[in-house]
Amino acid sequence: MLKVPLSDVLSQKMLFLKSFRYFHCTKYFSRDNASSTTDIFRNAMKRKRELANLKEQSHGNVARNAAFPKEYIKRPKQVPRNATNRKKILITWSTGTDRAKEAANSVVSEIFKKNHKGNIKVVDPTTHRIEPSNIRYFAKGIDLDKVGLSIVNVEQIDNENQIPLVKIIESRVALKKYSDFLAKKKEKELMELGVLNKSYKNLVTDKKEDNLKHIKISWQIESDDLKRQKAHEIVSLLKKGNKVTLYLDDKNNINSNNWLENFEELDRSQKGEPPRLPESVFQKRAAVLETLKEIVSEYANDPVLLGNMNSKMIMKLIPKDVKPQNNDKRALKELRKKERQEKLQKRIQRKKMNEM
């Protein structure tokens, strides 16, 4: 058996370990490189913390953006600069005096109060037919030096919608109606301030009432319906001080959509006479007309009649003025004071008209 000395084995093992150690550890830690090594370690740890913070912030932003995408994030709406002021309807008039423009604008304002879209019906001055329109288009081309606007009727479509019937009138008449409107408005303000006696409002019906009401009546109406329903409707309007115009025509014509345009020709003289009706039909129409005269005799002045019973008729009614009792001296004094104020107002308006 081969015998190897123990000292040789130990020396070989030591040689192997030394070579292994020298192979892996080529750089030794010494005093010279201690500070630089510490700085590297410290900078590495600092960088690691910064990266960790950035990662955490990025993760939080991603989570928020995922929960609330940009297009769904609700932001407070910016309040418009003139949010409290509603958009004003403006129609530019190129003709007419300032007074004529004010009168036209007051009619336009009233139209938009009754129909916010400005839809109206107009009477064509050439064909005298009623046609639908809009005030924005209808107002274009109107010469306020010659003509003006007036609402002659209001058609109730439903609880919310109304369509005014607008007609072109002479400029002089339009200015007169606007002056009456301003006087009426001023009187109301004085009553609210207590300058005028409010009880006077219940004693006198305003003579300048511009509110004109239209009522259709068929020649074939039953006597009971005429004396009850129609009579109540007519008398109620007259008591309120409204002017009322009654339109009498055949049942088929009065219920048509363009019924009003059939009466336009009655305001002008017509040539020729309509064909004579059978005696029974004529007597029926005469009875209807006589009943209407009896109904309105107490509440209206003498009616103005146009047309004839063989075709169609118009009855124009103006309410009677309410006169105070002779023993009511205070009411009589108020009435005379009112008349003096009206005369003074007319004198002022006449002076303004002459100055224009």
From Swiss-Prot:
It holds the Pfam family mIF3. Residues 1-32 form a transit peptide. Belongs to the AIM23 family. It comes from the Eukaryota. Keywords: Mitochondrion, Transit peptide. This is Altered inheritance of mitochondria protein 23, mitochondrial. It is found in: Mitochondrion.
